[in-house]
Amino acid sequence: KASVGFKAGVKDYRLTYYTPEYQTKDTDILAAFRVTPQPGVPPEEAGAAVAAESSTGTWTTVWTDGLTSLDRYKGRCYDIEPVAGEESQFIAYVAYPLDLFEEGSVTNLFTSIVGNVFGFKALRALRLEDLRIPPAYSKTFQGPPHGIQVERDKLNKYGRPLLGCTIKPKLGLSAKNYGRAVYECLRGGLDFTKDDENVNSQPFMRWRDRFVFCAEAINKAQAETGEIKGHYLNATAGTCEEMMKRAIFARELGVPIVMHDYLTGGFTANTSLAHYCRDNGLLLHIHRAMHAVIDRQRNHGMHFRVLAKALRMSGGDHVHAGTVVGKLEGERDVTLGFVDLLRDDFIEKDRSRGIYFTQDWVSMPGVLPVASGGIHVWHMPALTEIFGDDSVLQFGGGTLGHPWGNAPGAVTNRVAVEACVQARNEGRDLAREGNEVIREACK
């Protein structure tokens, strides 16, 4: 009879992929998954299944397994802990060997870790809560084109949050009227104005016309105020080539900053653009359109802190990060957790802020968090307190909605932010007297 190589049939994942005795290595990429298994599937099996399907595993032994070293390449579920207050959920910790991932590719990282496993039958739901990126891997990325310090030096603006404004109505203005709104806001005292995320190149306003009129607005406002101004020109396009064409044209116009929608545009396009921006001295503003599709459900998808880490590696100088106080969702401690992950070099593990792993970015530049969405001048005390100086505060309707017009709206915001910063520096309690501070300043 023929010799038997191995037993065919379906194998339990936990025999190979659940290894509670494993000591994680400094070079491992660690993931924390929130797992909701189907009824009857034990936690160890579900955790091991996640580790297997997002690394080397398939549902049975294949003879080519003998041609490689499984121990060197397999993902391992090394710890499981129940989620407080949830009966059928637990956190599975998975360690991936560094060699599973292509250097400098967020695309490959995500394809491996979250590519296939989320459709897995044995799981009712799965959410990636956090990733620990080891320096051995993060060092293969360029990261943000410039980072917080270089941006401040380029703009010559220190010691306060930067102010922005999204031009509204976001769709329908002609390029010239759009440029006029940009000029009024910048002239009134804002640092930046912004293309809305869905302003690309539509029939009512083609991208090139918008770029030209906005550049004119920037130059005029700079000449009149003596400050450096910018407008986030949205370079997002249907193809990478078209996106690069727009970024190159922006550079030729001499503007300081361009913008990209990194989730709809994709990580590959974003990383290419970030490299171009560093090589050519452009700042890069990142909008997170589509993030809530991925991060809003509490038990399925990916937490935004993972998308934020991925963006810091892929590259961007600003990224939208919720407001804590405006019209869109976001809890304070958790938001501050990923705001620190964007800005700081070293972030301690702190479960109360949703940070599952200590993250050491070594020398990778930081990203400025952008607070945007339904905020207005009376939120200013809270925003200065929550976000501190290293942030961009964006008031769209909160600038353009001023009954006297765009420029007075911009003046209001600039006066308010400077008053709040000064009051804070003098040791006054913004939470209590913030509104009073603003009223005094506006007299």
From Swiss-Prot:
Q: EC number(s) in its UniProt entry?
A: 4.1.1.39
Q: Which Gene3D superfamilies does the entry mention? A: Ribulose bisphosphate carboxylase, large subunit, C-terminal domain (3.20.20.110), RuBisCO large subunit, N-terminal domain (3.30.70.150)
Q: Which GO terms describe its molecular function?
A: magnesium ion binding; monooxygenase activity; ribulose-bisphosphate carboxylase activity
Locate the site labelled Transition state stabilizer.
327
N6,N6,N6-trimethyllysine: modified positions: 7
Q: State the Gene Ontology BP annotations.
A: photorespiration; reductive pentose-phosphate cycle
Where in the cell is the protein located?
Answer: Plastid, Chloroplast
GO cellular-component term (any): chloroplast
Question: What InterPro entries does the database record attribute to this sequence?
Answer: RuBisCO, RuBisCo_large_chain_AS, RuBisCO_lsu_C, RuBisCO_lsu_C_sf, RuBisCO_lsu_fd_N, RuBisCO_lsu_N_sf, RuBisCO_lsuI
Q: Does the keyword Oxidoreductase apply?
A: yes
- UniProt binding sites for Mg(2+): 194, 196-197
Q: Name one Pfam family in it.
A: RuBisCO_large_N
Q: How is it modified after translation?
A: The disulfide bond which can form in the large chain dimeric partners within the hexadecamer appears to be associated with oxidative stress and protein turnover.
Major place of localization?
plastid
* Domain of life, source organism: Eukaryota
Name the cofactor(s). Mg(2+)
What does the entry list as the binding residues for substrate? 116, 166, 170, 288, 320, 372
Keywords, A to Z? Calvin cycle, Carbon dioxide fixation, Chloroplast, Disulfide bond, Lyase, Magnesium, Metal-binding, Methylation, Monooxygenase, Oxidoreductase, Photorespiration, Photosynthesis, Plastid
The question of whether Metal-binding is a record keyword is answered with yes
Give the family, as the similarity comment puts it.
Belongs to the RuBisCO large chain family. Type I subfamily.
As a miscellaneous remark, the entry gives: The basic functional RuBisCO is composed of a large chain homodimer in a 'head-to-tail' conformation. In form I RuBisCO this homodimer is arranged in a barrel-like tetramer with the small subunits forming a tetrameric 'cap' on each end of the 'barrel'.
The protein, known as: Ribulose bisphosphate carboxylase large chain
Q: Which gene encodes it?
A: rbcL
